[in-house]
């Protein structure tokens, strides 16, 4: 392999790696957006669940089932 061929091969590899890095970076950014969105939804659902639990908890007696 001549030095020019070697240099060309290395340049091709670098270009492919840069493309892969850019693609992975885009995917990672989208995943972080999804994680952030889902975290916010989970927080809202947790708050809603706790509110509903507080509303119904006083009405539900804590007793052992009859088979105990």
UniProtKB/Swiss-Prot annotation:
Family: Belongs to the SlyX family.
Record lineage: Bacteria, Pseudomonadati, Pseudomonadota, Alphaproteobacteria, Hyphomicrobiales
Protein known as: Protein SlyX homolog
Organism: Brucella anthropi (strain ATCC 49188 / DSM 6882 / CCUG 24695 / JCM 21032 / LMG 3331 / NBRC 15819 / NCTC 12168 / Alc 37)
HAMAP family: SlyX
InterPro entries: SlyX
């Amino acid at each position: 392999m001549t030095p020019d061929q070697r240099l060309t091969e290395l340049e091709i590899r670098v270009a492919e790696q840069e493309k892969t890095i850019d693609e992975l970076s885009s995917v990672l950014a989208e995943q972080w957006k999804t994680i952030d969105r889902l975290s916010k939804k989970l927080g809202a659902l947790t708050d809603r669940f706790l509110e509903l639990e507080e509303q119904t908890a006083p009405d539900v007696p804590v007793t052992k089932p009859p088979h105990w």
